Amino acid sequence: MPGIVELPTLEELKVDEVKISSAVLKAAAHHYGAQCDKPNKEFMLCRWEEKDPRRCLEEGKLVNKCALDFFRQIKRHCAEPFTEYWTCIDYTGQQLFRHCRKQQAKFDECVLDKMGWVRPDLGELSKVTKVKTDRPLPENPYHSRPRPDPSPEIEGDLKPAIHGSRFYFWTK
């Protein structure tokens, strides 16, 4: 029926949460962006095309899974330098990177040595990229309404306006 909204079940919505603070997210942002680029862009493309978050639950679960795997790898291989780095960011008043360059260098070195991840250059993750996806294109990606007939038939005779043109207020 057109007026009934189908809501997902609780089992469909159940995922493990990424329970971390903003300082941890900020410290890991560059490497996370490089490692989880594809699932994040797939999810954002789905959200933009579908305009309905219920249709993008699977893509959202993949984003969450990638984030959890990413932070587990960081914890397993580079926990100490990463903790020093995000703690430094957390203790600076405005969470600025410039006060923590030494800790950042240690963390980047650890990530490069143990996992082979290179910190992306500034602006590399914000470049426009094409997303290759296996999802089918939505039937109506812009959610536009059907266009009306350009020149509808006018029914009956049209009479001139009673007071003439309404263009000027002083016309009768």
UniProtKB/Swiss-Prot annotation:
GO MF term set: protein-containing complex binding
Motif Cx9C motif 3 located where? 78-88
Cite the InterPro entries for this sequence: CHCH, NDUFA8
Ranges annotated as biased composition (Basic and acidic residues): 146-159
Record's Pfam families? Answer: CHCH (PF06747)
Q: How does it assemble?
A: Complex I is composed of 45 different subunits.
Q: Give the protein name, as stated in the record.
A: NADH dehydrogenase [ubiquinone] 1 alpha subcomplex subunit 8
Give the source species.
Pongo abelii (Sumatran orangutan)
